[in-house]
Amino acid sequence: MSVRAVRRAVMLVLVPAALLSQGSTPALDFSGVLFGNFQYRTDSAARAATAGQPGDRFDLGRAYLNFRLPAGDRGAVRVTTDVYQQTGTAAAYYAGWAIRLKYGYFQYELTRDLAGVQGLAAAARIGMLQTVIVEHEETFWPRWMGNSPTEFNGFFSSADVGLSALITLPNRYGEVYTTMVNGPGYSSGENDRYKDFAGRVSITPFGRDSGFLRTLTVTPWYSVGALASQFVLGGPGQVGPVSQGLEKNRRGVFLGIRDRRLTGGLELAQRLETVESGLNTAASPRLTSDVTRDLVSGFAFVRPLEIFDPKRRSPFSVFGRHDRFDNANVVGARNILTWFGALWDVNARMTFSIDYQELKAENPPVVPPTNTTVPTRSMFLHWVVNY
């Protein structure tokens, strides 16, 4: 056999194998977000830690790394790592930046024509996934500047471990999202036997239009859950273990719009909880009370030059946000967040903001409980890069 014939035979074997290898390699979709800030604090708490002088520091907020891969027929996997600085007890061992999992779930596309309705799609997820409302809010409020209203005020963590279902409505009319999760959030493991069940319906009534109201979204949502009693195991001197769960419900409605000229949101929400007091002993019996805490939040981002001239793309915008959240301990006491500033787009993927943030207690109790809000006043230089 000639050398040319041998070479031809080898090529006939290797080329199909190479093509098969290329065809069987799944496509990796990688993206990321990196953001941080410089902050200058002038409140009394900051001055107390610096001998009466204002405090300042550079901070790296987060580095999110997103990996998306197909996983078989109709299947896909998303893994998002969260690079953050250690705090709390973990900082005693290592106070630097660490990596943890933010999202890690498998998604299976059930159908694109649910119940025979064309365009009515359904998918299911399992793993560490989005909670009911936070990521939806973050399509209107930029996470790199700070937490969304519900996450900032302790309603939810942004991710948790469990199951979820997503139904996409036809003709761009919105979606339905439901979850069953552990409850503590992605930064903690499960700590009791209870689960949180939640759902939202996001309606875009003008989704098929091409005008300003195309992204207007109305989202009612509800979450039902419970917490274990602090006396679930009983103990020395107690009258016995407490097996009943404590109410941990949340509900609200979010209204949002997303356009280059104006992006904003308005949220009305409630935290409904059962709290315990006493020591669960004969001398100090366990008592429970139901507490409802109201949240009213609104924010807006405006590009004033584009409002006056829609054909002109401007890198400059201004924003403001105001949160009012009830204090659980005293009637009439509230935590007030005031936030405003200006943003500048360096390019299509990087943005800076200069903003002022103040958190204060309105009508604080005369004898503060341990969870009373510590007033803060800060100037920030925020920055974000998407890649």
Label every PLM stretch briefly:
Residues 1-24:
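Cleavable N-terminal export/targeting peptides
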Residues 23-42, 52-186, 191-198, 202-212, ...:
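Outer membrane beta-barrel
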Residues 41-45, 88-91, 133-138, 187-189, ...:
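Outer-membrane beta-barrel proteins
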Residues 41-50, 336:
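Juxtamembrane/transmembrane-helix boundary motifs at the membrane-water interface
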Residues 48-53, 84, 88-94, 148-151, ...:
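Extracellular loop and loop/strand-boundary signature of outer-membrane beta-barrel proteins
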Residues 194, 202-204, 210-328, 336, ...:
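Detector for outer-membrane/organellar transmembrane beta-barrel domains
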Residues 336-350:
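C-terminal structured "cap/appendage" subdomains that terminate the fold
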Residues 347-387:
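Predominantly the C-terminal beta-signal and adjacent terminal strand-loop region
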